[in-house]
């Protein structure tokens, strides 16, 4: 029997899985390109200010990505709850949950940002930033931190749109914001025309202005056009109930996502032991990675709504099929990406620096690290699938194991015995081991759900 859904909501329970994945992933690719080119464009323009400025912006990446990861995690919780209600044919509860989730995301963003801002100097000092580097770092982060609340709200709102099967609108929104950022960057960094020359601060202001415009548009869209967020605050009982469900998934998911920048911070500290030029090279490599794993990241946003709606409708066969199809495709795709990066490594390195040591280190990064991107894809898609199945603790355990049992420890051991080469190779080995563990974990989870479903029938 067909499941009835409102006209603005895509039915992901009956649409062919491959068709759903293609329809939802293609727009996400555009959105992801623009999202991650925010930092890449900033890095490129800032590189013209000199190696010191490039090194400073490289230090900010783990911290800025921590806030972004929290936003993504809360968005995962939002998407899982809303999509499950839609799959169970309860659109009213989906709207109530979406409304509550927006308020909670704003409140949590304010708390996390205030905490990070308060301990900013201590955080960057622990990462290995010198007193000299702290000057440009403060210039950038004192503007970026208060404005970052906007991106958390944008991420949550976009997740609600994806939960109803709409990945096109979030992609257009992020593409527009990315374009605005790219236009404003040279104007505010270098003071072109009537604009003031703000240097590092100009890059931060460009990003904040782009986010503000995107936030205003998205808020109007969710309330008045899509009508997935209510204009009035829900009752206390609804607020508590919906909030608990979202936070039960959102907090572990945010925690799991925040492992990534935390690990990146540790990896940056290890890179700092090789010298400032290596930090600059590692920072460039860290910004290339999201572009190289673009399809993985796009599918990590398009796959969960498909899984959540089918999980809510107890279509476990479709959940399993969607996961396996995604994994097979990602492994083949990332192999192609590796060869493209390998062949163009010299050209890519020369774009970001004219320092021979920095160029050599960027090339070494590109020759080794992308070998693990397909395996990293298995880990990311497994985590997003487990969250979509309302198993956030399993996803959190996998993230902890990946970063603090395999990825960072093996990279550190490699750096001790084989220098920079061992540092990169150790990280790839960590991804290999965790890719195997992640795949087995999903198989066990779906097998358990199938057994429970059969016993309940």
Regions found by a protein language model. Name each.
Residues 66-69, 181-186, 215-219, 291-294, ...:
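Hydrophobic transmembrane alpha-helices of multi-pass small-molecule transporters
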Residues 14, 18-37, 41, 63-70, ...:
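Residue-level signal for short hydrophobic patches within transmembrane helices
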Residues 75, 144-162, 170-178, 203-218, ...:
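Short runs within selected transmembrane alpha-helices of multi-pass transporters and secretion channels
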Residues 1-25, 82-149, 195-251, 307-372, ...:
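Short alpha-helical transmembrane segments in multi-pass integral membrane proteins
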Residues 54-114, 151-170, 268, 281-339, ...:
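Small-residue-rich hydrophobic transmembrane alpha-helices
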Residues 23-39, 143, 177, 210-214, ...:
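Transmembrane helical elements of multi-pass membrane transporters/channels
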Residues 33, 37-55, 124-131, 187-198, ...:
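Helix-terminus/linker motif at the lipid-water interface of multi-pass membrane proteins
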Residues 116, 159, 185, 189, ...:
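Structural signal for membrane-spanning alpha-helices in multi-pass inner-membrane proteins
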């Amino acid at each position: 029997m067909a499941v009835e859904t409102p006209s603005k909501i895509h039915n992901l329970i009956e649409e062919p899985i491959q068709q759903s994945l293609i329809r939802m992933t293609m727009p996400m690719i555009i959105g992801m390109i623009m999202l991650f080119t925010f930092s890449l464009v900033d890095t490129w323009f800032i590189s013209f200010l000199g190696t010191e400025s490039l090194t400073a912006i490289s230090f900010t990446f783990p911290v800025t990505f921590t806030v972004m990861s929290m936003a993504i995690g809360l968005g995962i919780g939002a998407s899982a709850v809303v999509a499950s209600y839609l799959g169970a044919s309860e659109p009213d509860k989906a709207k109530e949950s979406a409304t509550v989730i927006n308020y909670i995301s704003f409140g949590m963003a304010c708390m996390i940002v205030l905490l990070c801002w308060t301990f900013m100097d201590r955080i960057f000092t622990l990462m290995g930033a010198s007193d000299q580097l702290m000057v440009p770092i403060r210039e950038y982060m004192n503007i970026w931190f208060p404005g970052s609340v906007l991106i958390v709200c944008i991420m949550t709102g976009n997740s609600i749109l994806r939960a109803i099967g709409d990945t096109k609108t979030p992609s257009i929104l992020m593409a527009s914001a990315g374009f605005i950022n790219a236009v404003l960057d040279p104007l505010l960094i270098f003071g072109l025309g009537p604009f003031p020359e703000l240097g590092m601060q100009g890059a931060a202001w460009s990003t904040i202005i782009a986010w503000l415009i995107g936030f205003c548009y998205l808020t109007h869209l969710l309330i008045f056009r899509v009508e997935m967020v209510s204009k009035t605050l829900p009752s206390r009982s609804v607020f508590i109930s919906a909030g608990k469900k979202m936070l039960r998934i959102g907090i572990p998911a945010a925690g799991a996502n925040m492992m990534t920048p935390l690990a990146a911070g540790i990896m940056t500290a290890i890179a700092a032991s090789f010298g400032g030029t290596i930090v600059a090279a590692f920072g460039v490599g860290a910004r290339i990675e999201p572009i190289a794993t673009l399809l993985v990241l796009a599918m990590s946003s398009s796959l969960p709504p498909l899984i959540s709606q089918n999980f809510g409708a107890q279509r476990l066969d479709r959940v399993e099929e969607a996961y396996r199809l995604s994994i097979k495709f990602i492994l083949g795709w990332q192999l192609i990406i590796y060869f493209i990066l390998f062949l163009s490594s010299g050209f890519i390195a020369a774009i970001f620096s004219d320092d021979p040591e920095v160029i050599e280190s960027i090339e070494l990064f590109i020759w080794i690290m992308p070998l693990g991107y397909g395996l990293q894809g298995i880990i990311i898609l497994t985590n997003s699938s487990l969250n979509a199945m309302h198993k956030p603790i399993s996803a959190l355990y996998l993230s902890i194991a990946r970063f603090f049992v395999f990825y960072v420890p093996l990279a550190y051991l490699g750096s001790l015995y084989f220098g920079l080469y061992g540092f990169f190779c150790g990280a790839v080995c960590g991804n290999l081991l965790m890719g195997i563990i992640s795949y087995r974990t999903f198989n066990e989870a779906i097998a358990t759900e199938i057994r429970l479903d059969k016993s309940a029938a």
